[in-house]
Amino acid sequence: MTNTRSAVVLGGGMAGMLVSSMLARHVGSVTVIDRDAFPAGPDLRKGVPQARHAHILWSGGARIVEELLPGTTDRLLGAGAHRIGIPDGQVSYTAYGWQHRFPEAQFMIACSRALLDWTVREETLREERIALVEKTEVLALLGDAGRVTGVRVRDQESGEEREVPADLVVDTTGRGSPSKRLLAELGLPAPEEEFVDSGMVYATRLFRAPEAAATNFPLVSVHADHRAGRPGCNAVLMPIEDGRWIVTVSGTRGGEPPADDEGFARFARDGVRHPLVGELIAKAQPLTSVERSRSTVNRRLHYDRLATWPEGLVVLGDAVAAFNPVYGHGMSAAAHSVLALRSQLGQRAFQPGLARAAQRAIAVAVDDAWVLATSHDIGYPGCRTQTRDPRLTRHAGERQRVTDLVGLTATRNQVVNRAAVALNTLSAGMASMQDPAVMAAVRRGPEVPAPTEPPLRPDEVARLVSGAGVTA
């Protein structure tokens, strides 16, 4: 029997493509509408202003991408993306010292955002039931406060307006989502909004890696110590395709990185707690100038708490919960949201109550990422907040002491590290930290000596001795 149901997805980024690939299994046609023109290859586009900065697809999200779009991981790796084991493939100076490089517990896919988006888009659009409509903006939702029945759109070139009916509209348009305004036009109230704003600014530059370090080189990161009472300053070096390093430095309010090339190098060397990243890039070849971004506010819109919610509309991705990009959780949280919607479709099909149930399930799906990001940011000087979340506002001192104990132990205890890494990669939930074996390991404390210098392996040091000037 022919499936006559249709869906419209607003936004053709990562979240939009993933949800489209999922919806194509439940409806007869999916129309993806985006205001941008998409590049023919792995190039940047206007609608992803942060695409020049480092993006991480943690294993918790990568597995979902592979489940929805089988073969995507191999295609990314074939195009030069790096699969980096966590923690064995990273050299990380945490707030508690150098992380011991235990055997792989999770992983990340490291590549440019342009390559990642293009690959996922190409894989998604192989499905003939999915159509991409470019250079088109959404003007209004069709329907009323009880049911959304489609969208009214305008072609940006011709100016022509038309209506696109749909059984389900999914908004994945990101931080600039129009849903709040569009729902108000239907007579619905504004959702409760939370934000945690550390004032973080981050700056990024691309480098050509030294030839000997162009492959099989670890992710290198230097993190702030939130206990110091100073702005949080960080530096991350991530190997990506084509023998390049993407290097991002960041600082919270009062510790923002400079925008000039010399200032960037100085910040990477002297502005963070260890000069390793600065030393690594000192003799690498710069490929770009510095790009800065201030779009780092953690912001959450609680559509799930509205007293009424229209049938036929779901909001997910950054449009419902956007995180400080320094933690790399946005894409993986969006992937979990797609699974939450899929679960509700499987249980309810298109019966009444689907959209409300899905919106509530999405709120649950993004909650761990929300707590992980905001509980870190809220402790920095000058952080501005609007939240009633008791996990952030009550007993903060006691919670921080527990977090610090777990964080310290995770650097030198493999059992605790595996649990912490699973949580931080969104491969497991907060509840996993309450496992009796993990709690017992926390009580035992660190089990290996603390590294006193960057834990680069002999082969990694050997590849750098001739050119990178690294203190090891």
Curated annotation (Swiss-Prot):
One of its GO terms (molecular function) is FAD binding. InterPro entries: FAD-bd (IPR002938), FAD/NAD-bd_sf (IPR036188). The keyword Flavoprotein applies. Gene3D superfamilies: FAD/NAD(P)-binding domain. Keywords: Antibiotic biosynthesis, FAD, Flavoprotein, Monooxygenase, Oxidoreductase, Plasmid. One of its GO terms (biological process) is antibiotic biosynthetic process. Its cofactor is FAD. The keyword Oxidoreductase applies. Its EC number is 1.14.13.-. Disruption phenotype: Deletion of this gene abolishes production both of lasalocid and of the minor cometabolite iso-lasalocid without leading to accumulation of an identifiable intermediate. PANTHER family: THIAMINE THIAZOLE SYNTHASE. May catalyze the stereoselective double epoxidation reaction leading to bisepoxyprelasalocid A, a bisepoxide intermediate in the biosynthesis of the polyether antibiotic lasalocid A. This is Putative epoxidase LasC. It comes from Streptomyces lasalocidi. The lineage of its organism: Bacteria, Bacillati, Actinomycetota, Actinomycetes, Kitasatosporales.
